[in-house]
Design a protein with these regions (language model features):
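An N-terminal, well-structured beta->alpha segment
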Residues: 2-92, 98-99, 177-197
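Glycine-rich phosphate-binding loop
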Residues: 124-138, 254-276, 281, 324-365
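Active-site nucleophile and cofactor-binding loops and adjacent substrate-binding regions
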Residues: 103-112, 281-284, 306-307, 328
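Phosphate-binding and adjacent anionic-ligand microenvironments
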Residues: 299-415
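Short glycine-rich phosphate-binding loop at a beta-alpha junction
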Residues: 72-80, 104, 198-200, 302-308, ...
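N-terminal small/polar loop signature for handling phosphorylated ligands or for N-terminal nucleophile
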Residues: 69, 73-138, 185, 214-275
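Gly/Ser/Thr-enriched, mixed-charge loops and adjacent short helices
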Residues: 139-257
Length: 415
């Protein structure tokens, strides 16, 4: 559901009617966009500085042009709960329409719901306007074209289209589509809980709050919500469950409520963090051990992909379960591509992106992954602390981030 009425029948967001818009498009030329916003796995920048409404419009034109070139005239669009979202999404959609694409506007939803839309709707292209786990002044675009999540050179192709003015023109149509309810019901129908559980759900004021607590409750769990109101200021903690400091409140709540489990989601809901009943943070590579054991038990010989940041203990464990371990490059787009190539049924990254192909679609989905975890734990007589204690742990160095300027980071990487 959109907060702002994007278009009426006669005019676009610039106040132009159809004929005026066609004339304007034929003579319009894109400005020079900062190369720094075109990243390895997405397009991302600081709103009002490197990312403006004008930037969003031209990115929409480029995405639409590329989608049409791939034979996909329909594009789904979603956005997270950031304060800049309503205005930026208008210009993004207008750019897509002016490329000649039709747009299915699915409103304010988690990123996995956008991926879901790109799988179940007529069009297999989609754009998610999201800043993910970044600070409130950021926003960006995660892009699927013709079923492929863009990365690396594919993202640079969009930049080159804009710079060379290699952009299609047309007049598309937009319609609002409710995909969230369908996503909710499909997960609800897929998950079979053996017993109810008491779960603390921390959405970090991110967009997962529109569905995660309600879904987990619908699965039969008692939910204690924590920061589930969508607020683009992220007033309580940074929406990144990969950082232990962001789980302090969740751990305290799990202990005080004597809950069976704590779940935390990042800003756009494509990653999940896990805390046991004892307050132990479960790192994603250990979570993947449990998921791999479960998936391989039904699918002997299945490929299980993990990124290079994960523990080396995954290789012998997956082999011991009867699966085939595959180490791969870090990056959600790269993992999804590898899954398609190999036919893998499960993949995971140390960042908390978990990808299920068994019973699901193969995209990273923190909400579905949380539901699968609840299903597995509900079938075990042991508590979560005991279940994860059975898997080996390592002493590992936390991720070390070196602060550099935005302008210098690419030069440093190329050196």
């Amino acid at each position: 559901i959109l907060d702002i009425d994007i278009l009426d029948e006669d005019q676009d967001i610039f106040g132009l009617d159809t004929k005026e818009r066609e004339t304007a498009m034929s003579s319009a030329k894109a400005p020079n966009l900062p190369a720094s916003i075109f990243r390895a796995y997405d397009i991302r920048g600081v709103v009002g500085e490197s990312l403006t409404t004008e930037t969003a419009y031209w990115i929409g034109r480029a995405i639409g042009s590329e989608s049409l070139a791939k034979g996909e005239p329909n594009v789904s669009v979603g956005r997270d709960g950031r304060l800049s979202g309503p205005e930026l999404v208008q210009h993004l959609i207008q750019g897509l329409l002016d490329s000649g694409c039709d747009v299915s506007d699915i409103g304010m939803v988690p990123t996995p719901v956008l991926y879901y839309a790109a799988n179940i709707l007529a069009g297999k292209s989609g754009v998610m306007l999201t800043g993910s786990h970044n600070p409130p002044d950021y926003n960006g675009f995660k892009i699927v074209i013709a079923g492929d999540t863009l990365a690396n050179e594919q993202i640079q192709v969009l930049r080159k289209r804009i710079e060379s003015n290699d952009l299609s023109s047309g007049v598309g149509k937009v319609e609002q589509v409710d995909v969230l309810e369908r996503y909710f019901q499909q997960i609800r129908g897929d998950i079979a809980m053996a017993r109810p559980m008491k779960v603390v759900v921390d959405c970090g004021n991110g967009v997962a709050g529109v569905i995660a607590p309600q879904l987990i409750e619908a699965l039969g769990c008692k939910v204690i919500p924590l920061y589930c109101e969508v607020d683009g200021n992220f007033p309580n903690h940074h929406p990144d469950p990969g950082k232990p400091e962001n789980l302090v409140d969740l751990i305290a709540k799990v202990k005080s409520e004597k809950a069976d489990l704590g779940l935390a989601f990042d800003g756009d809901g494509d990653r999940v963090g896990v805390v046991t009943n004892a307050g132990t943070m479960i790192y994603p590579d250990r979570l993947l051990m449990l998921f791999a054991k479960d998936v391989v038990s039904r699918n002997p010989g299945a490929d299980i992909i993990f990124d290079v940041k994960c523990t080396r203990r995954l290789t012998p464990l997956i082999s011991g379960y009867g699966g085939r371990p595959v180490m791969w490059k870090t990056g959600h787009s790269l993992i999804k591509k590898k899954m398609k190539e190999s036919g893998a049924l499960l993949a995971g990254e140390m960042s908390g992106h978990i990808f299920f192909k068994e019973r699901w679609f193969g995209f990273d989905d923190g909400i579905y992954s949380a539901a699968r975890l609840l299903e597995i734990l509900s079938q075990d007589k042991r508590d979560a602390e005991q279940v994860f204690a059975a898997f080996p742990g390592d002493i590992s160095t936390p991720e070390i981030n070196i602060t550099v300027t935005e302008e210098s980071k690419f030069t440093i990487m190329d050196a």
